[in-house]
Curated annotation (Swiss-Prot):
Residues 106-135 are annotated as: Disordered. It comes from the Bacteria. One of its GO terms (cellular component) is cytoplasm. This is Small ribosomal subunit protein bS16. Keywords: Ribonucleoprotein, Ribosomal protein. Residues 109-122 have a biased composition (Basic residues). The keyword Mitochondrion does not apply. InterPro entries: Ribosomal_bS16 (IPR000307), Ribosomal_bS16_CS (IPR020592), Ribosomal_bS16_dom_sf (IPR023803). GO terms for molecular function: structural constituent of ribosome. NCBIfam families: S16. HAMAP family: Ribosomal_bS16.
Length: 135
């Protein structure tokens, strides 16, 4: 059975992962069939590059992505695109749906940033009040 999984590279405390297609019996950093992407979790925001055509090929031949790789693939929109193709949508429909999907994802990221900044500001205000009450 072929798995699509992460192979750790990089150095100590600075991981960089290759997204590879590998036999399920091989060790994590052992033999693999093909490199199909990269993932840098330490970059802000996380950097993910995936060869979409090769991921689609391996998944169509029966390769199973691990949970982490599945979430990375989902974040690039590839799973949604593959689902639309499987449903029999035309190329124009797929392109328009993917543009809508990208817009929704951008909007969600912006909302998350706003919420995060509000939480930071509230935390700073609470710390300021606590410091003022102690003095």
């Amino acid at each position: 059975m072929v798995k699509i999984r992460l192979k750790r590279t990089g150095r100590k405390k600075l991981p960089i992962y290759q997204i590879v297609a590998a036999d399920a019996r091989s060790p994590r950093d052992g033999k693999f069939l093909e490199v199909i992407g990269h993932y840098q979790p330490t970059a802000k925001p996380h950097a993910v590059t995936i060869k979409k055509d090769r991921v689609a090929y391996w998944m169509q031949t029966g390769a199973q992505p691990t949970d982490t790789v599945r979430s990375l693939i989902r974040s690039t929109g590839l799973l949604y695109e593959m689902r639309l193709k499987k449903m029999g949508r035309s190329e124009e429909e797929i392109v328009s749906e993917m543009e809508k999907w990208q817009a929704r994802q951008t909007e969600r990221r912006q909302k998350r940033l706003v919420v995060k900044s509000r939480r930071r500001q509230a935390k700073k205000e609470a710390e300021g009040k606590a410091a003022g009450a102690e003095a």
